[in-house]
């Protein structure tokens, strides 16, 4: 078969696959529209009285800026080797983290902040100051280096190892800041207490996991040496292992085997764990020796379908879960198209196509939708007079901003590395200075030669 015929066959198969996927999702959306489109009865709900909304909103924005956004910039600086700049900005984060834990409070209308939010605040204080300490050691801060014990510790550990520790701790502060920012509204509205605690934990962990999964996808996509790394294993191989392990844990923790009866919830989540570890085994086998495979993406599609079919107590909750499942299925399907048809089972291409940014965004968006799909939050939406469409739009708007911040941080990191290669001064100025130095050295040599020639010769 000639190259032209191969391209024709490949293009035809790609078109057929795309048409089938479009038909599948069109049928899914139309099928959902045929369901009961009624609304929840809100006659029993009263509009909530939010006390000091302005000051609480400003407090949350400050927490967002100093405990999540600024630490993200610090992490970029740390990974780019700018330890001094990272440590300087980290001082600001550490001071605010202490004020957040010691003075400021995310209190509900009863003046109470839950223990999880309070404990996270104090944990973040300790973590930020420890990170700042290691940053000072790695950067050679004066008052720290004066101590003989610290000098011995630095010499034994090595500056390179200390910088690695600082990078890891800096990234951990970003993750903890994400938890704190997400817990703040929970504390302000008094959510996730008593019987609702388990549901909030499940939605928070699973939703954040999808957001982190999307970040890893875009990290591999944007950073060129990770994208083009010639390793013995592919990204699908790692994904399959993670899904397999997570599936095993989920299978044996969602139900007390032999100690209680089975409920619909147990069936749903336990069998979801089973499909994760069984699919993970197949994915591990097919992706061995560095090969690509569709299995992790297919597992995501089935997970999205299962979540979209979960019936909830509230109609708005059912519709939000349905949207979450639909977006998750889109992410898995787009990933299959990328691997099988765009990359053609290769690791990477010469350049990044705009299409490749879509699958990670779907994962980030689905994660935020799942985090916002717990029952108490949706009851608050009903009490405020909103519906599922407005709620989904505001969450997707947040997903756009989160995804923008992820890509912006990665691009900022690459910019710092590029500036580091060029040097502090502009390249033209450096070349000019180098030429001046060379000419100055030549002048010195010529002057020395003249002096030697004019030296009197004594017989």
Swiss-Prot record:
GO cellular component terms attached to this protein's record: membrane
Topological domain ranges for the Extracellular compartment: 1-6, 81-82, 144-170, 227-266, 317-322, 373-389
Topology versus the membrane: Multi-pass membrane protein
InterPro entries named among the record's database cross-references: YTP1_C
Predominant place of localization: membrane
Keywords carried by this UniProt record: Membrane, Transmembrane, Transmembrane helix
Subcellular location(s) per record: Membrane
Cytoplasmic side: 28-59, 104-122, 192-205, 288-295, 344-351, 411-459
Domain of life assignment: Eukaryota
Keyword Membrane: yes
A UniProt-annotated Pfam family: Ytp1
Presence of keyword Ion transport: no
Ranges that cross the membrane: 7-27, 60-80, 83-103, 123-143, 171-191, 206-226, 267-287, 296-316, 323-343, 352-372, 390-410
Protein known as: Protein YTP1
Designated gene of the protein: YTP1
């Amino acid at each position: 078969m000639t190259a032209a015929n191969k391209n024709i066959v490949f293009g035809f198969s790609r078109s057929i696959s795309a048409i089938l996927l479009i038909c599948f999702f069109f049928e899914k959306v139309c099928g959902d529209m045929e369901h009961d489109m009624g609304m929840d009865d809100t006659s029993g709900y009263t509009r909530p009285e939010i006390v000091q909304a302005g000051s609480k909103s400003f407090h949350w924005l400050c927490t967002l800026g100093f405990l999540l956004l600024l630490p993200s910039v610090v992490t970029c600086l740390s990974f780019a080797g700018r330890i001094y700049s990272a440590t300087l900005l980290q001082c600001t984060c550490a001071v605010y983290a202490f004020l957040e834990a010691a003075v400021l409070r995310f209190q509900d209308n009863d003046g109470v902040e839950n223990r999880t939010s309070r404990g996270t605040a104090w944990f973040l204080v300790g973590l930020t100051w420890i990170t700042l300490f290691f940053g000072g050691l790695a950067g050679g801060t004066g008052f720290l280096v004066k101590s003989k014990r610290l000098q011995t510790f630095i010499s034994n550990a090595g500056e390179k190892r200390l910088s690695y520790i600082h990078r890891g701790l800096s990234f951990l502060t970003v993750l903890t800041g994400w938890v704190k920012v997400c817990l703040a509204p929970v504390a302000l509205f008094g959510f996730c207490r008593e019987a609702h605690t388990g549901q909030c934990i499940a939605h928070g962990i699973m939703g954040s996991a999808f957001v982190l999964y999307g970040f890893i996808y875009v990290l591999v996509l944007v950073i060129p040496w990770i994208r083009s790394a010639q390793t013995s294993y592919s990204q699908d191989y790692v994904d399959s292992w993670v899904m397999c392990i997570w599936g095993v844990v989920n299978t044996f923790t969602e139900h007390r085997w032999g100690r209680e009866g089975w409920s619909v919830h147990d069936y749903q989540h336990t069998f979801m764990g089973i499909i994760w570890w069984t699919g993970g085994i197949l994915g591990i086998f097919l992706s061995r020796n560095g090969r690509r495979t569709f299995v992790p993406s297919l597992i995501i599609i089935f997970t999205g379908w299962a979540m979209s079919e979960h019936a909830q107590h509230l109609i708005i909750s059912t519709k939000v879960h349905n949207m979450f499942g639909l977006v998750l299925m889109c992410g898995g399907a787009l990933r299959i198209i990328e691997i099988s048809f765009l990359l053609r089972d290769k690791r990477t291409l010469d350049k990044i196509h705009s299409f490749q940014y879509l699958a990670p965004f779907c994962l980030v968006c689905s994660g935020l939708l799942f985090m916002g799909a717990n029952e108490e939050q949706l009851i608050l939406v009903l009490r405020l007079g909103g519906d599922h469409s407005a709620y989904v739009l505001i969450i997707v708007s947040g997903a756009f901003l989160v995804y923008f911040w992820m890509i912006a941080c990665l691009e900022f990191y690459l910019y710092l590395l590029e500036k580091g290669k060029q040097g502090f001064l502009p390249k033209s100025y450096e070349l000019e200075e180098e030429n001046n130095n060379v000419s100055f050295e030549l002048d010195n040599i010529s002057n020395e030669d003249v002096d030697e020639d004019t030296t009197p010769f004594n017989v």
